[in-house]
């Protein structure tokens, strides 16, 4: 009887230990995912803001030889320069986005669909910006009615410093919602 009681107590203690370990492991997993997601989310959003920065510094333009400067029409040169600048700026988004998408897949598996849908909204806004940039750069190449004047895209693309920036406000709203939903998982 003593052996049975001892084995029963030992089994109970072992079971409680495994349960505690499992809870700690899940808490650590949630914490690591939440931390990684918030870091990648902030890098992603900051990269979007950098794309929208109205200042284009001299170092961002492509290096060209003097011969190229004389052989290219001004509109074509301006088009190529803008494409180069925005492609380089967008590369930062392309570099961080796969990590964020990986986080979103993990979030969907562990925490459900709610956050995934918010990330979809954020990715849709970034895609909208991408299309606007294409239209903006094309406006330098095509000086006809098909494309608007480049200045008409300014408020959508480079409005990053104006107080009434609806695009930035929408991104910040989604970012805040995501951060608020992730916050509870940052507790160990």
Report the location of each language-model feature:
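Transmembrane helix-loop junctions and nearby membrane-interface residues
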Residues: 11-18, 47-54, 132-136
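Short amphipathic alpha-helical/adjacent loop interface patches that line ligand
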Residues: 18, 41, 175
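Interfacial loop at the N-terminal end of multi-pass membrane proteins
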Residues: 55-68, 76-81
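Membrane-embedded hydrophobic alpha-helical segments
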Residues: 1-24
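An amphipathic alpha-helical interaction surface
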Residues: 68-74, 84-188
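Amphipathic, membrane-active segments
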Residues: 22-63
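Terminal, low-complexity, charged helical segments
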Residues: 5, 50, 113-114
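Membrane-embedded alpha-helical transmembrane segments of multi-pass integral membrane proteins
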Residues: 6-9, 42, 127
